[in-house]
């Protein structure tokens, strides 16, 4: 699975990049036909929930999207990955 990370108004350090790669690559265990994944990080200001992560995942002929905001990118990533797991399980059951 190919993972592309895009950051807007965010300084993407190596530890955050590694965390994203580790967590998102584990989604392969829930569906083995994931083609590619785009992860978008965005910081929209100084508010409490201004850190946003969006995961866009291509599976066969479908595109799945999970979008979460939180005070930290790590928490937003956990929420988005959990949301994506649910979507992948639902598709696999069909």
Predicted features, each with a name:
Residues 1-94:
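N-terminal, polar/charged subdomain of small-to-medium soluble alpha/beta proteins
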């Amino acid at each position: 699975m190919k993972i592309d990370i895009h950051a807007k108004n965010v300084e993407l350090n190596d530890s955050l990049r590694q965390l994203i790669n580790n967590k998102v690559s584990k989604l392969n265990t829930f569906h083995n036909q994931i083609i590619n994944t785009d992860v978008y990080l965005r910081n929209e200001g100084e508010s409490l929930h201004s850190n946003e992560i969006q995961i866009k995942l291509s599976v066969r002929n479908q595109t799945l999207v999970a979008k979460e905001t939180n005070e930290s990118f790590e928490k937003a990533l956990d929420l988005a990955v959990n949301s994506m797991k649910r979507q992948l399980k639902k598709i696999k059951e069909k």
